[in-house]
UniProtKB/Swiss-Prot annotation:
This is Uncharacterized protein R653. It is found in: Virion. It comes from the Viruses. It comes from Acanthamoeba polyphaga mimivirus. Keywords: Virion. GO terms for cellular component: virion component.
């Protein structure tokens, strides 16, 4: 495993750390910001008031000094949404698509597309960044359609994302009384074939978190190749 940490990972962890230390605020809203890195942006606080794609948009601009024009030329959108990230990764435009779980690294991005989203809505899917290497789990609690299979593997993957719904109890936003929303870190579960090819996911590690096959919600993983 390489000790190198990509720029987007460093900036995302910094923002998450400072907000978790109450040096800033976060809230999930369907807006494109503001997202501030405190004194690194000549601001007095760290802030992330946006949705999943808004956070990643700001993260890429901050990490690679991209202008709004750069983002529009890259994504063909004034405000790239989750589905735009899915399509961009799928077509390997500025990303290298990674299909095998064993090749995933911190700093890679996971994009999920909701095929039946309404065109007028911002909730087109989800985009999140991998925060640590995937860890294999005991193959139990398999989805019903795979109960008789011995070649389905499960991995827990820690991600950083901006969401209205935390990833279960192992999430920095989790509270038994009242969950928080906004920027945080939690675990999703990825399912693979025996060779490591990703076939689906679940939102959290909870037994109640249902399996979603890639044929229902297409899922791709991409590694930036713009730096």
């Amino acid at each position: 495993m390489d000790s190198y940490e990509p720029s987007q990972l460093i900036w995302a962890r910094l923002l998450l750390y400072e907000i978790s230390k109450r040096n800033g605020e976060t809230e999930y809203q369907h807006t494109n910001g503001p997202v501030w890195w405190g004194p690194n942006d000549n601001k007095t606080v760290y802030l992330s008031i946006t949705d999943c794609s808004g956070f990643v948009n700001a993260l890429l601009r901050k990490s690679f000094e991209l202008s709004q024009k750069d983002m529009v030329e890259w994504f063909d959108s004034q405000r790239p949404l989750a589905v735009d990230y899915y399509n961009t990764i799928y077509h390997q435009n500025g990303f290298t698509r990674i299909k095998n779980i064993y090749k995933l690294e911190p700093g890679d991005f996971i994009a999920i597309k909701f095929p039946n989203h309404h065109p007028s809505l911002d909730d087109t899917g989800h985009i999140m960044m991998i925060n640590s290497y995937p860890e294999i789990m005991a193959s139990k609690n398999l989805p019903d359609e795979y109960q008789n299979y011995n070649n389905i593997l499960q991995f827990r993957v820690n991600v950083i994302d901006q969401t209205a719904t935390p990833h279960g109890r192992y999430d920095t936003r989790y509270s038994p009384d009242d969950n928080q929303n906004g920027l945080g870190s939690g675990y999703i579960k990825l399912y693979t074939n025996i060779d490591g090819t990703i076939i689906g996911y679940s939102w959290s590690l909870s037994k109640k978190s249902r399996y979603i096959d890639k044929t229902v919600h297409p899922i791709v993983v991409g590694r930036l190749d713009i730096y």
